[in-house]
């Protein structure tokens, strides 16, 4: 970090404990929020995480492999699901903003309704612009009835059986 290390460490510690991230945290001098988030999302042992047949992610991919054209709506920013699908040879598409679209030939369509932060491209503006972090961003998103994010969720919640995994809803 370029700024005060102790201050950066305190912010890093508390950001994960708050329901909403303040836009002030994202603009704090010397603290690279996106680099820290990327590190938190992807610092793990891939072999242990992706090859563990008892993990929730592994079992989800087992299920998705057996289905023909399934939709996944995720509130996660990471691409771990995509990595495991690719590793298993499952064709998928990713939708994370107004300029990305599903593919009829894909077996799985993955909708990142709060944005996407790929492991190796976390500094690219198109991904950073897709992320929903702050209270203001959540307010704007959920009060915009014409956004694809809301329309997709409402459609699937109304017409499909939905399973929530790893979400507290509190």
Predicted feature descriptions by range:
Residues 1-170:
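Conserved catalytic-core helix/loop/strand module for nucleotide-ribose chemistry
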């Amino acid at each position: 970090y370029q700024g005060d290390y102790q201050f950066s460490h305190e912010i890093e510690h508390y950001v994960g404990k708050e329901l909403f991230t303040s836009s002030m945290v994202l603009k704090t001098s010397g603290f690279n929020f996106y680099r820290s988030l990327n590190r938190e999302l992807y610092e793990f042992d891939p072999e242990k995480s992706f090859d563990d047949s008892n993990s929730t992610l592994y079992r989800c991919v087992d299920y998705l492999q057996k289905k023909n054209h399934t939709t996944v709506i995720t509130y996660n920013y990471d691409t771990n699901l995509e990595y495991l699908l690719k590793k298993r040879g499952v064709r998928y598409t990713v939708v994370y903003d107004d300029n990305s679209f599903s593919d009829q030939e894909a077996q799985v369509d993955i909708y990142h309704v709060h944005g996407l932060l790929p492991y190796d491209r976390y500094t690219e503006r198109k991904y950073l612009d897709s992320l929903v972090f702050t209270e203001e961003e959540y307010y704007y998103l959920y009060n915009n009835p014409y956004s694809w994010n809301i329309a997709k969720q409402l459609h699937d919640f109304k017409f499909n059986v939905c399973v929530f995994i790893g979400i507290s809803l509190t």
